[in-house]
Amino acid sequence: MNSSNPLVITLLGPTASGKTALALDIAERLDLPVFNVDSRQLYREMDIGTAKPTAEQQARIPHHLLDLRTPDQPITLQEFQAIATPCINAALEQRDVALLVGGSGLYLKALTSGLQPPAVAPQPQLRQQLTALGQQICHPLLQAADPKAAAKIAPADAVRTQRALEVLYGSGQPMSRQATAAPPPWRVLELGLNPANLRQRIQQRTEQLYRDGLVDETQRLSERYGADLPLLQTIGYSEALQMIGGSLTTTEAVRITSQRTRQFAKRQRTWFRRQHNPHWLPDQATLTDAMTLIEQHLR
């Protein structure tokens, strides 16, 4: 790839690793907007539970690819790719450099590596049927039909399980057989965060989510879209729903959310290790090291 090609900086790492704070600092130094690559932050009204950049942070630095749809309008990976790629290319035409930030490894890979997701539109009727069956049945179904895809999806992750089954039934092809086309003509610099104190950071983040009003946000979403909304089965929202229903105390909800988040972070780390090759930034002087690497690639 020619060094004259535009530079795309991707900042990746597990949840609660400090991506947002570092992204804001990098964006400020380079006078760049931030492109979101977090799959749950694509949805409006889901702010606290997804740790979406606050209004103050978004006022400080422009953000793109946030709040694309309401939670009852699922965005497929292919749709995200079709929306995001032109936006990034438009920014590259202006500055020749762009900053992507997120913990959704598959979404990052789709953008930077030319991964071609299956062209299967959301199927509301099928999703209703799968929701009625329950995740205890759906995940084993996926394991039997597409074990490679199932191995990458947590048994409790109803959203991704349903999408994999949707692709399987809609196309006749397993999700794991996604094709790869030529990657875009970008130079990609991957910067990774993996702090040693991640467990502590996750616990602090979880407690903060509940203090900030996660339960109230979940209540509003449940009233507007129904408690069976697939996104309300994801980490944090699921436990908040159980609190609302009276089956969990606050202490229990925080503990379970923190535990599930740690498990999710472990899967993220595994994905980044297998699918990406980032420059892992140290826990100290992180911004300094990041800017040194970026400046080397901008020369």
UniProtKB/Swiss-Prot annotation:
Lineage, broadest ranks: Bacteria, Bacillati, Cyanobacteriota, Cyanophyceae, Synechococcales
Annotated family: Belongs to the IPP transferase family.
Signal sequence extent: none
HAMAP family documented for this protein: IPP_trans (MF_00185)
Subunit structure as annotated in this protein's UniProt entry: Monomer.
Organism name: Synechococcus sp. (strain CC9605)
Annotated binding of ATP, by residue: 13-20
Pfam families given in the database record: IPPT
Name of the featured protein: tRNA dimethylallyltransferase
UniProt catalytic activity: adenosine(37) in tRNA + dimethylallyl diphosphate = N(6)-dimethylallyladenosine(37) in tRNA + diphosphate
InterPro entries cross-referenced by the UniProt entry: Dimethylallyltransferase (IPR039657), IPT (IPR018022), P-loop_NTPase (IPR027417)
Database matches in Gene3D superfamilies: 1.10.20.140, P-loop containing nucleotide triphosphate hydrolases (3.40.50.300)
Binding site for substrate: 15-20
Top EC class, one word: transferase
Keywords from the UniProt entry: ATP-binding, Magnesium, Nucleotide-binding, Transferase, tRNA processing
GO biological process: tRNA modification
GO terms for MF: ATP binding; tRNA dimethylallyltransferase activity
Site (Interaction with substrate tRNA): 104
Region (Interaction with substrate tRNA) residue spans: 38-41
Task of the protein: Catalyzes the transfer of a dimethylallyl group onto the adenine at position 37 in tRNAs that read codons beginning with uridine, leading to the formation of N6-(dimethylallyl)adenosine (i(6)A).
Cofactor entry: Mg(2+)
